[in-house]
């Protein structure tokens, strides 16, 4: 009762009863005592010194493993990586494990619970209230953290309004456990292009994002999302995928129906950039990618097919590629059974595109589209997908650390274990440079000097 009363008092100050309910639900779901939760959420004081003893360290800078390294933490930051712990110091012993920087997932949806078919999506928008979805979202945020993702970029609430802003803020205020979050609030698309679709014209149904038409309305929508707390702007640039032969022998081109006009896209990108907000574009195929690159977005999401000329432009302009491989494989069978067999063809096309992107020198950031698959599935499966598609384990790890931090503009704070950066540390048994699948078994997670998993 005391915890509920305290939570109610604090949340009323923030005018958000939803966050309070979500906090209580997340605590109960985790099966932790309130005392343990309080200890784990305590913000590290500036003078608190802790030492983490690692059997091996991959610091995210050189990717050359160093053996028997002790990391000194002061408050929520790393102080040094070459200082022995004095007698009587607080030491977390990970001498049997490999330590590495907290991981970064640059494409998530904490407010989705799996989206294989249209029915899966419709159910969540029609039968789950925004409040209920927010509660589930707080649990998913905690799962992301315990999987080892200490930072995520959540790219759209899919009909849950601005709940991502509340979750982000509650995490930042240590009300609930979760990763650092950059959020995109409501994504943007044109009328008639995004679910819910196919209902009778006289039936009013919710939509998974904000519908906008015309350059002026597009600018207004960007301003609205920023005013409600968006760190990023998310746009949907294509739909209606189909395959046809390309100009080269054996080439398959994944084509599409573009959504926004180039003028509309340019208006949104210009407005976002004027207000110091980057833009992520859902662009799966030929035209959506090309228009997004021409408009100057900051990242291409999915990119199952990207023409060579656009890959060259992305490399030249510094546009990031967030491929989300695993989710495409996860949903393909279900969507094919629903009447869209193109999703089965897209797997091979995606692999071919990924290999060309690597060769072209495009910056590739790790992103999973978690929420597109159930959050009980470990998003770290994406690492194995990236290696199977042609990356080395080191490249895959770099995509989820240094490259991810650069995409998010957080390279001064995260992405490596070095003095001055946040004490975001994860640990695994085994060597992820030899077998990236060990990242699916992370058993120690620290964010900002606070232990959320393991290390007792």
Model-inferred region functions:
Residues 123, 274-278, 346-432:
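His/Asp/Glu-enriched, well-ordered alpha-helical/loop segment
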Residues 97-175, 191-194, 198-201, 295:
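Metal-associated gating/positioning segment near the N- to mid-region
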Residues 36-37, 42-48, 57, 62-100:
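Histidine-rich, glycine-flanked metal-binding segment
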Residues 16-27:
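Bacterial N-terminal signal peptides
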Residues 111-133, 191-206, 241-259, 316-347:
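Active-site gating loops and adjacent loop-to-helix segments of metal-dependent hydrolytic enzymes
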Residues 214-237, 242-321, 345-364:
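Histidine/acidic residue-rich metal-binding segments in metalloenzymes
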Residues 136-163, 177-187, 230-240, 278, ...:
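Divalent metal-dependent hydrolysis catalytic cores, especially in the metallo-beta-lactamase
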Residues 115-117, 164, 193, 244-246, ...:
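Histidine/acidic-residue-rich catalytic or RNA/ligand-binding cores of hydrolases
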């Amino acid at each position: 009762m005391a915890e509920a009363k305290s939570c109610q008092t604090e949340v009323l100050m923030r005018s958000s009863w939803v966050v309070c309910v979500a906090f209580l639900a997340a605590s109960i779901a985790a099966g932790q005592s309130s005392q343990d939760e309080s200890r784990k959420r305590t913000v590290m004081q500036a003078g608190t010194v802790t030492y983490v003893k690692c059997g091996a360290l991959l610091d995210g800078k050189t990717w050359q493993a160093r053996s028997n390294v002790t990391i000194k933490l002061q408050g929520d930051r790393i102080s040094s990586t070459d200082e022995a712990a004095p007698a009587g110091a607080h030491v977390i012993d990970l001498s049997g494990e490999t330590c590495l920087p907290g991981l970064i997932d640059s494409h998530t949806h904490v407010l989705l619970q799996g989206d294989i078919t249209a029915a899966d999506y419709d159910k969540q928008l029609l039968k789950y209230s925004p409040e209920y979805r927010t509660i589930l979202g707080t649990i998913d945020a905690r799962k992301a953290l315990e999987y080892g993702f200490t930072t995520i970029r959540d790219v759209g609430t899919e009909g849950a309004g601005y709940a991502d802003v509340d979750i982000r803020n509650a995490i930042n205020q240590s009300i609930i456990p979760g990763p650092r979050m950059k959020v995109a609030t409501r994504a943007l698309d044109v009328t008639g292009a995004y679910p819910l679709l196919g209902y009778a014209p006289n039936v009013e149904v919710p939509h998974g994002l904000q519908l906008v038409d015309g350059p002026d309305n597009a600018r207004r929508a960007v301003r609205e999302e920023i005013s409600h707390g968006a760190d990023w702007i998310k746009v949907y640039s294509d739909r209606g995928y189909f395959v046809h032969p390309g100009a080269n022998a054996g080439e398959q081109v994944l084509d599409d129906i573009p959504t926004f006009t180039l003028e509309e896209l340019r208006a949104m990108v210009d407005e976002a950039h004027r207000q110091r907000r980057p833009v992520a574009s859902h662009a799966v195929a030929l035209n959506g990618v090309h228009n997004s690159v021409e408009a100057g977005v900051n990242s291409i999401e999915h990119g199952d097919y990207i023409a060579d000329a656009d890959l060259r432009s992305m490399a030249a302009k510094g546009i990031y590629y967030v491929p989300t491989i695993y989710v495409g494989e996860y949903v393909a069978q279900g969507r094919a059974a629903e009447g869209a067999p193109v999703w089965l063809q897209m797997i091979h096309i995606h692999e071919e595109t990924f290999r060309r992107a690597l060769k072209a020198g495009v910056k590739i950031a790790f992103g999973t589209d978690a929420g597109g698959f159930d959050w009980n599935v470990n998003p770290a499966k994406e690492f194995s997908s990236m290696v199977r598609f042609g990356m080395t384990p080191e490249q895959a790890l770099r995509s989820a650390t240094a490259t991810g931090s650069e995409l998010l503009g957080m390279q001064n704070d995260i992405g490596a274990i070095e003095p001055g950066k946040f004490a975001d540390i994860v640990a695994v048994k085994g060597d992820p440079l030899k077998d990236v699948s060990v990242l699916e078994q992370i058993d120690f997670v620290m964010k900002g000097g606070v232990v959320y998993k393991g290390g007792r």
